[in-house]
Design a protein with these regions (language model features):
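C-terminal motif of bacterial Sec signal peptides marking the signal peptidase cleavage site
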Residues: 20-22
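Terminal, low-structured helical/coil segments at or just beyond the last alpha-helical repeat
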Residues: 27-36, 45-53, 191-221
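Canonical tetratricopeptide repeat
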Residues: 100, 134, 168, 202-203
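Structural marker of alpha-solenoid helical repeat scaffolds
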Residues: 90, 124, 158, 192-193
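Structural signature of tandem alpha-helical TPR/SEL1-like repeats
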Residues: 74-83, 107-120, 142-154, 177-185, ...
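Alpha-helical segment of the N-proximal tetratricopeptide repeat
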Residues: 57-96, 100-103, 107
């Protein structure tokens, strides 16, 4: 029960980050960019045809996908699932929609089913780094911390300065009891973005570190 409570607090924080930056959902995962990364396979299909009907379908699909991301950021998981499903119905090869639906499904209480969708998203588009982040979060929700850590690491292979993937790894090491690595990774995250200090100081992952001299120095307690 305690682990589940801590995980929910972790997820709520990351949804706030998503709402502010779009990380892992509708934005490029590069921490210093905010341009949209929501182009789906349906958009590409629509651009290759002059048929008005196909163009209209593409617009509607984009609307569903955008609505799904907005609902997810707002914590409206059921709506996010419904909108992503509508997007998938219009294009069964829309990997981004599968990724969003998978994350929403996991947050809605079915991490195993959510993982099926995020894996499908990877099969459809193995180069979608945003889905790597979602995979990491879904594995974390399922308690598979080593798998989660591997997917955060895959994000960092493409984007070494992705603050919240670095921080995600720090929290995993903290939860696993590896204090040295937890603080090493926390220090890396803080060097990328100093706002991590206040986050780490307040999150339960690092609550037991509050008397740790190195931790106090890192976060300024």
């Amino acid at each position: 029960m305690i682990g589940e409570f801590l995980m929910k607090k972790f997820v709520l924080f990351f949804l706030l980050i998503i709402a502010l930056t779009g990380c892992g959902l509708n934005q490029n995962t590069n921490s210093n960019k905010t341009e949209s990364n929501a182009t789906s396979s349906a958009t590409a299909t629509g651009s290759s045809t002059s048929a008005a009907g196909n163009s209209q379908a593409t617009t509607k699909q984009d609307d569903h996908l955008i609505a799904a991301k907005q609902a997810l950021s707002a914590g409206e998981y059921t709506k996010a699932i419904e909108e992503a499903t509508a997007s998938i119905k219009q294009d069964a090869n829309n990997g981004e929609a599968y990724s969003v639906r998978g994350f929403a499904t996991a947050l809605n209480g079915d991490a195993a089913k959510g993982l099926t969708d995020t894996k499908k998203a990877y099969d459809l588009d193995p180069n979608n780094v945003a889905n790597y982040y979602n995979m990491a979060m879904v594995y974390k929700l399922q308690g598979q911390l080593n798998d989660s850590k591997q997917w955060f690491a895959k994000v960092l292979e493409k984007d070494p300065s992705n603050t919240w993937s670095v921080y995600g790894i720090a929290t995993i090491y903290a939860d696993q009891g590896d204090d040295t690595k937890a603080l090493d990774w926390l220090e890396k995250a803080i060097k990328i973005d100093s706002s991590v200090k206040s986050v780490a100081a307040e999150q339960d992952h690092f609550e037991r570190f509050h008397n740790n001299r190195r931790f106090k120095t890192l976060v300024g307690l």
